[in-house]
Amino acid sequence: MTLQIIAGKAGTGKTTHLMDEVGEKIKKTSKTYIFIVPDQMTFQMETSFLNKQNLAGMLGTQIFSFSRLAWKILQETGGLSKTFLSQTGIEMVIRKAALDQKDKLKIFSRATSKKGFYSELAKLFKEMKQEEISVDELEKSAANLSTSVSSKVHDISLIYQKYEELLAGKFLENEDYLRLLADKIIESDYLNQTEIIIDGFTSFSKQELTVIEKLMQKCDKVTVSLTLNVPEIHKGLEDFSMFKASTEAYFALLEMAKLNKIQVEPEKILLENKRANSDSLAFLANAWGDNKYSSYEGGANDLTIHQANNRRAEMEGVAREIRQLALNGYRYRDIAILTRNIGDYDILCETVMESFDIPIFIDKKRAMAKHPFIEFIRSSIDAILFNWKYEPIFQAVKTEFFFDVAENATIMRRKADILENYVLENGIQNKWKWEKEGDWIYRKIRGLSTNVLPQTDEELATQSVINEMRNLIVEPLSTLENNITKAKTGIEFAMALYHYLEQVKAVEHLESWRQVAEENGYLELAREHEQAWSSISELLDEFVEVLGEEELDVNSFSEIITTGLDALEFSLLPPSLDQVVLADMENAKLLNMKVIFAIGMNDGVMPLRQKDKGILSDQDRDSLRVENSNLKPSAKNNIGEEDLLAYKIMSLPSDKLFLSYPAADEEGKVLSESNYLRKIKGQFKNLNESVYLTDPSLLNDKEQSSYIRSKQATLGLLTSQLQMYKRGYPLSNVWWDAYNSYFEDSKESEAAKQVLSSLYYENKTKPLQETTAKNLFGENIHASVSRMEKFFSCEFQHFAQYGLKLEERAHYKLQAVDMGEIFHGAMEWISAELKRTNRDWGNLTEEECRQMAKLAMTFLAPKIQHEILLSSKRMEYIQYKLLQIITRATTVLNEQAKSSAFRPIGLEVDFGLKGDIPPLKIPLQSDSELLLQGRIDRIDAAEQDDRTFLRIIDYKSSSHDLALTEVYYGLALQMLTYLDIVVTNAQKMIGKTAEPAGVLYFHMHNQYVQAEKELSDEAIARELQKSSKMKGLILSDPVAVSLMDTNLEKGKSSNIIPAEIKQNGELSARSRTATKAEFDKMRRFVRQKYQEAGNKILDGAVSINPYKLKEKTPCQFCGFRSFCGFDPSLASNQYRHLTNEKTETILTKMDIEGGTQ
């Protein structure tokens, strides 16, 4: 029994030497030669053996990792009777242990609910087993340390002991196999007459060293290769040496041999770099291996450093280099891309390499958490825990496992959308509402539902869909909840979940998806669907094995299962024979690589700016290591490991090394280059440095040609180059050749035309054809005033809402429009009640005003937005605040009525074909008509001296005034339209003609009075009355004004209307008035605006043409903005800038444009 150490720096041929030596020995002896390599290296080592002529097909060689050797020996000697626990199972058991000990924990009681806590604990427990650290040793190390450290160790010990208790006698984890292997090696016949060759390790855990010690005692010979700087062996250990770990291993092996009286053969030291095929790469590897600063004066064509604008530009630059290497004869399998942060590059790399038609293998396991099946299970459990709230329910619905497998998925998705809309609109947020007996009733009601009509056929059809989908969810989810609620033990919980998955036919869903993916050539996706079910089956099996007899509650079950789900990962297929590999620098074990791309070489990444993370902080570790040196050192002591990682990269390729870094991240944050790159630049005087450009136009023709990739991917870049050409920049012939190539192939030309058409893209709409317009809007247009205002705001907004009939999704929340409905409804109810009891607004007492307001709110509250005002304490408070506003408004109207001769003659008066007043008919082109319909809040009338006056009052929940500029541009037509309608129909309404008295806005709000000194009650009342003054436009007639405010005195301003009387009895300039002639001009003009709008609608006007008046624009609150794509930065998208003009100018324009009709 002997030990031999093969030592040398990276690239000196240690692995090749060992393989050649075994190749020679195997010809002369019947011994078995076993190679032990790291897990990540086994596949490549097997491939190397197959490709090695003197070893190919040799039966006397075997390749194992430590864990695979353990399986082999334990199969032979016994020891596999216990159940193996996966990483998922380990984390579930740790969570169970932590939950059991939660009340005893001093530090980690809150952390038990945090995601990631259990994976960190699993890492620590793994370290303790690998380094053979017992709980007693850890507690002893912490005995004299600070309270925070000793409390952490106390918690770790409690959880670890419970964890071991749960595993005891029944289960094994990976680290337990090495312990069993060490015990069973002596009994193995398989290891008789064998030589062990250990290669590819930079260090060994204490557990691995124990296994090696047992192998030394059993096997004929143990050979270990170590990457060392040989002079350091004899100088002794340096704290920050990159070879510290391997030097420690070297001395540990010699010490073990000495203790076990194992003969040590002379060590073989390899000094010559046999890997690097160029002087520059050989110099780089040697310089870094010696850790000495020296400079290289020669050419360095095989070593380059590249900067890129961002990670995408970097990845595309790498892809272009790989394409060129392939053209020069390199195989893809000769090339590897290494990165420190594979999570920053994996998806990007896959996308970019696909666009360049480069086969890529990404050496990273992907979490299973986002797979629909995993999400379905998690969301279903959350739905039960959180009383069937909307979010988890519909997260589960959208995975499609509730759907009938036999139904068309597209139809089922549409039905699910209908259900979701209903749930959101009706505020269905708990189990009681979901399981309530009877069908859900669907009515398309907006605002107040004071007059509910019978359901239409369309509503009944929608209701049927809603209840169909509701039942698909409620039945299985209720069964799951009932079973989980009854469950007491782990096995009962697992059975409840398994039966639920059976009930929704999860296997059939996954199998159906797998078949579809396979038929469409998505083989990896097909494998994922297959793995998802097998992983869940294994997870439940492990759960039952470990916790089947344990008593649990619903919360504990949820937490443990969620931990298991979080730990699930998709397994990796080994790479094909010819693929580029993307791998993580730290874990990659690569052999025979000719070209290496080291990407993301930024400061803080290489070397890594260590963060204090994990269960034990750096300070904790430093303190504990004083007593227990087996514990891994703190991150701040890992400088040597960072240098070793960089050295591994520098010495890995035989032919070429490309180093690159992005200058900014995705958000534009500046990133600087690694210090390692600065060091290399200082060493190499003739180093090739360049930039991976996003825009190739600055390069020569040959360099630009490297940007040409697959036809599909090149289209985007070609488009951007042609865009630059359009702006006057020169265009290389490379791009004209690419352009022509698309139109030589009829299959490609259509796609090319579609993409290249973006060069001439303008975000403009074309007018609808006449027949289309009439199909959408009708021969005669039935419209409201607000609709016409919307048309003048933006034609496309009108088209989207009234032509395409698009609607924003309704949510169960009280919005401004709902409050407006309540205010209108309250005023209507109070007025109707006064009329019914033959009372007048001006005769009410203050107490009667309060009572009226309260009764109105009591009547209206259940009738707004599916009883939203009755749904919660918060809504109860909002109802109280709304009542205050209604009460205040009632009081103000009462006060105003006492000082006014005007009285309401109509409230919520409908005009239209079925209204109290006929529609306003506007003649349009081609014998069509525009029929205006709507509802007028309030019509007031007053009489004096055989003159009758009519005015319009509109209740508003926010402050409004009549701006003639907005009237002129068609943005505020409502009030003057209503006035026109009532004056025109006065004979029908009141049996006589009438004059327009004005239009006024009544602001419904709860006013506050601000004063610098204390005010009397009378003064406060006066101030409140002033703040309630109505805004708008009134007739400049002393009679009309005096009827509106009977208390208005000379030299005073009205507290009711926008009028002020001068001392001479005339209206002041501060009054908002218009003459009857001016009102008539405005009425004619408004009709003309409707005619203009109606004709344009019939002409198919759908332009994206929002206005801008000062800072006001319809886009601010438009729900269709993402749909129309309006972008003011485009020349084709500009606002219609409207200007404010003087009243006289506006009236003159109205007179000219309004005609004489």
Curated annotation (Swiss-Prot):
SUPFAM superfamilies: P-loop containing nucleoside triphosphate hydrolases. ATP binds at residues 8-15. Residues 1-277 form the UvrD-like helicase ATP-binding domain. Pfam families: ADDB_N, PDDEXK_1, UvrD_C. Its EC number is 3.1.-.-. Residues 271-590 form the UvrD-like helicase C-terminal domain. The keyword ATP-binding applies. Keywords: 4Fe-4S, ATP-binding, DNA damage, DNA repair, DNA-binding, Exonuclease, Helicase, Hydrolase, Iron, Iron-sulfur, Metal-binding, Nuclease, Nucleotide-binding. [4Fe-4S] cluster binds at residues 794, 1115, 1118, 1124. Binds 1 [4Fe-4S] cluster. GO terms for molecular function: 4 iron, 4 sulfur cluster binding; 5'-3' exonuclease activity; ATP binding; double-stranded DNA binding; helicase activity; metal ion binding. The keyword Nucleotide-binding applies. Gene3D superfamilies: 6.10.140.1030, P-loop containing nucleotide triphosphate hydrolases (3.40.50.300). The heterodimer acts as both an ATP-dependent DNA helicase and an ATP-dependent, dual-direction single-stranded exonuclease. Recognizes the chi site generating a DNA molecule suitable for the initiation of homologous recombination. The AddB subunit has 5' -> 3' nuclease activity but not helicase activity. Despite having conserved helicase domains, this subunit does not have helicase activity. Heterodimer of AddA and AddB. Belongs to the helicase family. AddB/RexB type 1 subfamily. This is ATP-dependent helicase/deoxyribonuclease subunit B. It comes from Listeria innocua serovar 6a (strain ATCC BAA-680 / CLIP 11262).
